Amino acid sequence: MTRRTPTLTISVLLLAAACSSTSTGVSAAPPSPTQTAASHTPKPTVAAPTQPDKIVVVVMENSPYDTIAGNPALHFIGGTIAPQTLTLTQMHADSAPSLPNYVWMAAGQSCGADGSDTAFDRTCPSLFDQMDRKGIGWTVYAEGYPGGAGSCFTGVSSDTASNDYARKHVPSLLFSSTSAGAACTSHVKNFPNDTSADGSAPVNNFKGVHLPALTFVIPNLCHDMHNSASQCGAAQGGQAGGDLWLSRNWASLTQDAGPHGVVILTWDEGQPGSEHIATFIGGAGTSAIGGTQDGHAYDHSSTLRAIEDALGLPCLAGACGATPLPILIPAN
């Protein structure tokens, strides 16, 4: 006799399960309109910080960090610049004396210039070469630069003592590829030092001139804290002279950088053996970080890396392993 019990049992169980489901009404209730709306409400997006469209780098001279940051004698740096900017508390120079540090800012290495202030015409690749290849605009404004009007001046210093121009502080004139011809005449200019009658009021240096993507500003030796007051006389000199120069020019520089630009104020070197230097990052678009500090370790390769990242350029030498300076524009 054929046994059908298993088939019958399975059928009975399926029928019982169906009846149980129907009779008890156990099923997921449709979500309420409130639940549906809540589950599909998009989270607000937070705008990411953006790269600046203009970068201005102002380089001062020979000042250890603790003689700049918090120095009550430097009224403008302490009273205006620091509250408006991000202060980098662990920035260090890479070499000594001055010249190799300026090379490092543009090449991520000293290119064999360590220990020399006259090792011009370096042949290693530089930021300026990168920008020229991509057609990105750049200018170096050196205060007291004797060249111009189609001429390129490559002398070590200016012919007049009162000018206090020094080639060793002009980054692009330290490389053979950008210290002659059109690369020099088109990009290196005298800083338009438009002072008031008594030399004390803030000025508008560029008078609406459209700044390129990258601008270096190099004050002369009496305005960059390099020369002492006794060397500069009426030009004041020393750290007080540099603070006064910044008080006349800072507003113009930050304004001319535009609403999405940044100004990096840094020093070439500090003190032998330490090279701890001050650096401030400001500009119209950085007001959200004004008066704050960053304690991460940075150096001149970090400056180069930040510029390369902002301009979409590949890294050079030491910049490849460097932490970029925090120059991103915070979202509003």
PLM regions: where:
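C-terminal motif of bacterial Sec signal peptides marking the signal peptidase cleavage site
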Residues: L15-A18
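Extracellular mucin-like PTS domains
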Residues: G25-T45
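Bacterial signal peptide processing site
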Residues: S20-S23
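Flexible, surface-exposed loop/gating regions in the mature catalytic domains
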Residues: A38-N332
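Bacterial N-terminal signal peptides that target proteins for export
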Residues: M1-T9
